[in-house]
């Protein structure tokens, strides 16, 4: 199977303006993500850039970036435009949507995403970490994946921001990286927004409500996710060069 990692990136962030260009120990955050993906050596890597400034910083480190429309509603829409511009002969089988705000993403996480697509009966793959505290379950800023029986079936039954504590043993802290079989991405983009997607503000519910199968792979450690200035300061402390 031929795999392509696409990192969607745009400057317009309500909580942290110009987030992709934020400096982490001498390099823009988007460069850290790009380098981690490239060093994993499991797929070709490009950036779907919503702004020329992002395209330029990636090209300055020898990478490839596709300039997309700036006003896409989601990262999935952005990577789909980039895919069609970059791969006009449809040579790639799988597409990995890697968020541009995960500056210390590990190779094993990306490897897991790809291997799930190849080994499971799923349309989409994603990642999670076992939830260890009630506080995580009750925190609406943490998206949870619910699987009734992971030992028999790693297909996600539901995603939500809050669940009853009685479901603790079946909940996983969701990490927003997605692998798509190419035809699944094409199908997903063609679907209308679903009710749960709108109500919960979770794009992946569009797939669930249209009977697309999302496989969850477990990893041991959450990557840093940078959404606020506090997250950025934490990343700078952790990622000391």
Whereabouts are the PLM-identified features?
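A conserved hydrophobic position in a structured secondary element of the catalytic/binding core
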Residues: 49-50, 105, 180, 227
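Short phosphate-binding loop-to-helix
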Residues: 46, 52-98, 102-112
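Short, high-confidence coil segments that cap the C-terminus of an alpha-helix
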Residues: 42, 90-92, 120-123, 212
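Conserved alpha/beta core of the MobA/IspD/sugar-nucleotide pyrophosphorylase nucleotidyltransferase superfamily
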Residues: 169-241
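N-terminal glycine-rich phosphate-binding loop and ensuing alpha1 helix
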Residues: 1-49
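Short, acidic/turn-prone active-site loops that include or flank metal/cofactor-
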Residues: 11, 69-75, 221-223
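Conserved core of the sugar-phosphate nucleotidyltransferase
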Residues: 105-194
